[in-house]
């Protein structure tokens, strides 16, 4: 039984629904056969990522159920020299059902969201009591038996779309919906480890948003982390409400994931940056002045002002008026209403007109 586990955490302070619409979700990923549950538990308790509610762990096991002995690599072999998927996953992925149950229990105890990607039908049955929703890997978007099995649980589904075209996405969505999936989040993904910035094609999120307005969108990121965590921030601004990123304790560890993953420093940097972005975005609301603009609104806008001294009873024309700051008098938006009106008293040049200065029409 193969399970490629994801541990996700909601960065919002409260989860009101399993629906992803109100939550910012983050996947972190790591795998190494030398890890054991006690060391992972310690990591979850003590690491900085645990403090912000993100679990830094994911494994796959039993390569024989999803990769033939003749399956070639699809990662950067200059970073991970193993050229066979079967050999790589046999070498590094070692957790089974007991370990996943223990991890799920530990996550529940520490209020960390546990979710896993099943890679075979039996894994769906094993995971179903442990998770609130399922993640389907890009590689299985064309695997109808697995899609149907996951959808039949009735739980929300995160569907990755790496290396897929629109026809394949449509087909997968049709299968999921017909088999019982009600809530689906579609993930943009480039199935290339690592993904160069010019190949990330975050603009595809715009196309996916236009094609599937009824779906929630996400982004599974395989670019190398940078100081600004640009890819994740950009995807979020383009509408991705679910973000997925590989995580490791040590980028030098062997395997096809560590060398392009984020570490604890990257994750904390991302948290800081996304907090700043959320501050910049503010709440979604109709365009209107905010409290700190009131003084500027008053003093930086213009009023109708006299260009010369005028005697009481003078009938105003274009030549008598100019728009000047501040905006404490009659607004230039009322220009046409003022033209032709008479002044009610003597007024000096540069006087800011008010309605009291004019006779009634």
Q: Where are the predicted features?
A:
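Low-acidity, Ser/Thr- and Arg-rich intrinsically disordered low-complexity segments
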Residues: 1-47, 56-61
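Catalytic cores and adjacent flexible loops of soluble metabolic enzymes
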Residues: 45, 55-361
